[in-house]
Design a protein with these regions (language model features):
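Short, low-complexity N-terminal intrinsically disordered segments enriched in polar/charged residues
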Residues: 1, 19-22, 33
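An amphipathic, aromatic/His-enriched active-site/gating alpha helix that lines ligand/cofactor pockets
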Residues: 26, 30-40, 56-92
Length: 104
């Protein structure tokens, strides 16, 4: 079953957002290297320095999340509560439609 998750959170400063972005980029570097199957992952940094993660992945409830199981994601999670402002909002999502060309 394909899981679709949207995660949002705010950052207290541009400096905290810069560090968060570096760690997110590390996750993408590891995903590019390991190339897990059936994974789509997009992270956006908004103008107010908040972040939105959108992930699509196939794994059963008894299987490991292919994104969250990377070493780079573990590094991203370290001190995340201290880097962000407030909590994390995460919801499952239903795909209504998609059109994707090269994203830059």
């Amino acid at each position: 079953m394909q899981k679709r998750l949207v995660t949002r959170y705010a950052m207290p400063s541009a400096e905290a957002a810069d560090e968060n972005q570096r760690r997110v980029e590390g996750v993408f570097a590891e995903l590019a290297e390991t190339k897990p199957d059936s994974v789509s992952y997009i992270v956006l940094r908004l103008a107010d320095d908040s972040f939105v993660h959108v992930s699509f992945h196939n794994h059963g409830d008894d299987e490991v999340n292919p994104i969250a199981s990377t070493a780079a994601f573990a590094h991203f999670q370290q001190d995340h509560a201290d880097r962000r402002q407030g909590g994390v909002e995460q919801q499952t999502a239903q795909l209504v439609g998609a059109y994707i060309t090269t994203i830059d």
